[in-house]
Every structure is written in structure tokens, then in C-alpha cells.
């Protein structure tokens, strides 16, 4: 009966408010798991010698959520022991040092959760329709994700 109360769950969220590492990691904690692995992608203050002021993210929300759910399904097929998965991505303005994406995965042992987190971030960058604009001191640039399949279809 207790196992049912801790059935595997996926927590997907796109939000414009500041992301909380504590909140996201708490979502995946389970008494059945000895590992919680995290990836936190933050805004850095420079890119190729240019000073970054902040980032701005936009998404095709419904498709992004669908793709994020698909990533969770794929993780569960590849690593059946994974318990809970949380993928939270920020939209709008993300200041320097703040998180733009937090991924948390719990599993009984570390190998599965570490591998699953790596798969999640790599697949998210390659398949989820979220776009990043870097704002510099005197210009801005929409960033093409080299891993993104639709951006590279003509190459």
C-alpha cells in the first residue's frame, strides 16, 4: 500500500517566476530512493567575450510541455528504476546567476539518476521548442541551439 502512495510521478513546469532548486529537488525525494540527481542551468555573465546582461526565453508552450512529457516517458523506458522526474524551465527574463532550467531525478541508485539527468538536459535542448535570446550591453542575439533537430534540418 505504501508503494502506491509513492507511485512514479513526472513534474513538468514552464514558468516566468524564479525557479527554486529546493522546491524542484523536494518533488522527487522518495523513501524508496537513495539518489537524487540534479542539473541546474544558470545564466552566465559572458559569451564569446561579450558581456551578457540577462537571457530571455520564449516557448511554444503546449508543444514544449508535450515534448517534456515525452522525455520523461523515454527516461522511464531506458531506466525503469527511476522513481520521480522533475523538469522545470523558466520563461521570460532570467538574470545573471539565476536558474533557467532545473532537472531532478530520483532512483534507488546513483547511476540511473545521473544518466537520466544527462539524457533529460541533452534531449530537452535537442527537441523542446524553447528559444533563448542573449541580451548584451549593446546588442542582442537569438541563440541557435546546435543540438536542435529543426534548426539543423537543412544542413
Swiss-Prot record:
InterPro entries: MoaE_sf (IPR036563), MOCS2B_euk (IPR028888), Mopterin_biosynth_MoaE (IPR003448)
GO BP annotation list: Mo-molybdopterin cofactor biosynthetic process
Pathway assignment: Cofactor biosynthesis; molybdopterin biosynthesis
GO CC terms in record: cytosol; molybdopterin synthase complex
Keyword Secreted in record: no
EC number: 2.8.1.12
Binding-site residues for substrate, renumbered to this chain: 109-110, 125, 132-134
Catalytic reaction(s) noted: 2 [molybdopterin-synthase sulfur-carrier protein]-C-terminal-Gly-aminoethanethioate + cyclic pyranopterin phosphate + H2O = molybdopterin + 2 [molybdopterin-synthase sulfur-carrier protein]-C-terminal Gly-Gly + 2 H(+)
Tagged with keyword Transferase: yes
Pfam family, one: MoaE
Keyword annotations of the record: Cytoplasm, Molybdenum cofactor biosynthesis, Transferase
GO terms for MF: molybdopterin synthase activity
Top-level taxon of the source organism: Eukaryota
Subcellular location: Cytoplasm, Cytosol
Family under the similarity heading: Belongs to the MoaE family. MOCS2B subfamily.
PANTHER family given in the database record: MOLYBDOPTERIN SYNTHASE RELATED
General remark: This protein is produced by a bicistronic gene which also produces the large subunit (MOCS2A).
Complex formation: Heterotetramer; composed of 2 small (MOCS2A) and 2 large (MOCS2B) subunits.
Protein name, entry field: Molybdopterin synthase catalytic subunit
Record gene name: MOCS2
Amino acid at each position: 500500500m505504501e508503494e502506491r502512495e509513492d507511485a512514479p510521478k513526472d513534474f513538468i513546469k514552464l514558468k516566468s517566476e524564479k525557479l527554486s532548486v529546493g522546491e524542484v529537488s523536494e518533488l522527487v525525494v522518495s523513501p524508496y530512493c537513495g539518489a537524487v540527481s540534479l542539473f541546474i542551468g544558470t545564466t552566465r555573465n559572458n559569451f564569446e567575450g561579450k558581456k551578457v546582461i540577462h537571457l530571455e526565453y520564449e516557448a511554444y508552450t503546449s508543444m514544449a510541455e508535450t515534448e517534456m512529457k515525452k522525455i520523461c516517458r523515454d527516461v522511464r523506458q531506458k531506466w525503469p528504476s527511476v522513481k520521480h522526474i522533475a523538469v522545470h524551465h523558466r520563461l521570460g527574463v532570467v538574470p545573471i546567476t539565476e536558474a533557467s532550467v532545473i532537472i531532478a531525478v530520483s532512483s534507488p541508485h546513483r547511476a540511473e539518476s545521473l544518466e537520466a539527468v544527462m539524457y533529460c538536459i541533452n534531449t530537452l535542448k535537442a527537441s523542446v521548442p524553447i528559444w533563448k535570446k542573449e541580451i548584451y550591453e549593446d546588442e542582442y542575439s537569438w541563440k541557435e541551439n546546435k543540438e536542435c533537430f529543426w534548426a539543423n534540418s537543412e544542413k
